[in-house]
A protein has these predicted regions:
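Conserved helicase RecA-like core
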Residues: 1-149
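Basic Arg/Gly/Lys-rich low-complexity intrinsically disordered segments
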Residues: 57, 128, 137, 141-179
Length: 179
């Protein structure tokens, strides 16, 4: 949430790996004053189209999505992409962050890496894209370290456009455990 506020997000797609996490994240964001819609494969086609249209029309600034939104969606002027979960397939990362900065426009992408598995997947992504992903570490909402590689145990990774790390994904009592 702090990143959303700090970045002055106009509109953003926030990717989660599991539908259950999408629902939990929407509840958490809503409790903290954010407006968001879901987009995932278990929704009917009409529900997906309605959610997407509300997002494109600017009625709702945040779309919390599964990888169903990572390919084939062209959202003009998308300011940010957040990977709430690091994708387990490096190619999915490339497709996710490709939703922003399209058609010569600028955009920013952030990936929250909070586990050893996340760091492992980041390594696969860096190998695929043939470059290191800049990292910054945030503790209690403050940047404590930034650079190409962080020695912190839970760095947050960016795609080279920007980066951030939350000490925990949410501070709500129901925060999800990702597997």
């Amino acid at each position: 949430r702090d990143i959303l506020r700090h970045e002055a997000v106009k509109n953003a797609v926030i990717f989660c790996n599991r539908k259950r996490d999408i629902a939990e994240l929407i509840k958490s964001l809503t409790r903290h004053g954010f407006s968001a819609v879901a987009l995932h494969g278990d929704m009917t086609q009409s529900a997906r189209l309605e959610a997407l249209q509300r997002f494109k029309d600017g009625e709702v600034p945040l779309m919390i999505a599964s990888d169903v939104a990572a390919r084939g969606l062209d959202i003009a002027g998308l300011s940010h992409v957040f990977n709430f979960d690091v994708p387990s397939h490096a190619e999915d990362y490339v497709h996710r962050i490709g939703r922003t900065g399209r058609a010569g426009k600028s955009g920013r992408a952030f990936t929250i890496a909070a586990s050893k598995d996340d760091i492992k997947y980041i390594g696969f992504i860096e190998k695929l894209i043939s470059k290191p992903i800049p990292q910054i570490t945030v503790v209690d909402g403050r940047v404590v370290e930034s650079g190409a590689k962080s020695s912190a145990s839970k760095p947050t990774i960016s795609d080279g456009k920007a980066g951030a790390k939350a000490d925990a994904k949410t501070d709500d009592s129901h925060a999800s455990e990702n597997s």
